Amino acid sequence: YVHHAWIYGLQEGKIFLEGVYPEAMHCFIYAMNVLFGIPVYSSLLFLGEIHTSAFLIAIYCLLREVMKSQYTVYLVLTAFLTVDVMCVDEIYGISRLQYTIPQEFGLYTEFLCAMYLIRFMRKKQDSKEKKDDMFLFTMALASSLAIHFYVTIMAFFLCGSFAVFGIRKIFQKKNFGKLIAAVIAAVVISTIPMVLAFATGTPLQGSLNWGMNIINGTDTKEGRTQVAQSINDESSMDEAARKLLESSSE
């Protein structure tokens, strides 16, 4: 298990064992082991249920911020958890929530980003609560980027979908300047270790190719089917060649 190996790499003092990659989840599990003696294997085995709970709670908090009735929130969450949609991509996405992997570990942060952005826009200028919300928005954004780049991309689109309804407040001079400063601070906080590692010669981790596949449109249900079909065809050809060789030797 690749993430298991990276965490043990941290224990051995080898940061970014297989290249530069957001390692906030790995550092969290490593810290749990060092501070509390929780075995790395146990964290990997059971943390999925915990971060899934945090994910659902974050969704609840965001929906409570934008919906008047708490029962509507319960209805939305119930539908999300129970409606059976026969779609391979959706089934695959839900199944990933049970695993301890960085993208799913950080999903809760995107909902916190949106929630604190909404709160920031609603509060009066220069109030203590507004400053607190801006700080928490910055920390949520920094956490998303330190955990997984794709979580930050999702947070951007989620925040944008709510910002559309308060576009005038977004571009007010005081608000816009603070938001830009918050985003810059979040990027600096989360990327300094990765930038320094890359600048000192550590290569990027190879899984960035996944992002390129998404951009190219090959990481789809059809694309995965084509890959599986090509592998099956290659296996069939290998089997046919083996039988031909066996018959020739006879």
Q: Which residues does each PLM region occupy?
A:
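Membrane-embedded transmembrane-helix bundle of lipid-linked glycan/lipid transferases
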Residues: 1-250
